[in-house]
Amino acid sequence: MAEGETTTFRALTEKFNLPLGNYKKPKLLYCSNGGYFLRILPDGRVDGTKDRSDQHIQLQLYAESIGEVYIKSTETGQFLAMDTNGLLYGSQTPSEECLFLERLEENHYNTYISKKHAEKNWFIGLKKNGSSKLGPRTHFGQKAILFLPLPVSSD
C-alpha cells in the first residue's frame, strides 16, 4: 500500500450467536465500599462477604449484547436480579430483571445498572456493612456501586 492510500474494511453483519456457555472464567465482584465480594445465597438473598473462600461469591458473567450482562452464581445457578422496588435477589431463571448494563468507569472499576430500571439509574450496590443496597438509594459517585472483577484464584 502506497503512502496516502486508504483501506476500507467491510463491517461484519453476521451474528455469532454464542451459546450461554462458559466462554469466560468465573469472577469475583469486589466492592470498593468496605471490601466485600458480591454473593448470591441459595435462598435468593444477595449480600457481600469478606470471605474469599465462600463458594457463593463465584459469579459467571454472560454477555447478552455489547455492554449488557447476566450475572449468575456458579454455586447456586441463580441469576442476580433487581425487582421493581430496587431489591437485589437471586432468580432461578433469567428475565428482564436479571439484565444489567455494565460500564467500565475512569477509575477502572465497573458499575452495573439495572437495564429494566435504567432511566432511574438504579445500580447494583453494597452498603459498608455488606448488605445489599436498594436501587433507589444508589447513585453515580458512590463507592457502594463500584465493583472490580477479580479472578477466582489468585495464581
UniProtKB/Swiss-Prot annotation:
Listed SMART domains: FGF
Query: Which modifications occur after translation, per UniProt?
Result: In the nucleus, phosphorylated by PKC/PRKCD.
Q: What is its main location?
A: secreted
The family database entries (InterPro entries) matched by this protein are listed as: Fibroblast_GF_fam, IL1/FGF
Q: Where is this region: Heparin-binding?
A: 127-143
Q: Does the keyword Secreted apply?
A: yes
Keyword set for this entry?
Answer: Acetylation, Angiogenesis, Cytoplasm, Developmental protein, Differentiation, Growth factor, Heparin-binding, Mitogen, Nucleus, Phosphoprotein, Secreted
GO BP field = activation of protein kinase B activity; angiogenesis; branch elongation involved in ureteric bud branching; cell differentiation; cellular response to heat; epithelial cell proliferation; fibroblast growth factor receptor signaling pathway; lung development
Tell me the Pfam families matching this sequence.
Answer: FGF (PF00167)
- What family is this? Belongs to the heparin-binding growth factors family.
Question: What's the name of the protein?
Answer: Fibroblast growth factor 1
Could you tell me which species this protein originates from?
A: Ovis aries
Q: Which gene encodes it?
A: FGF1
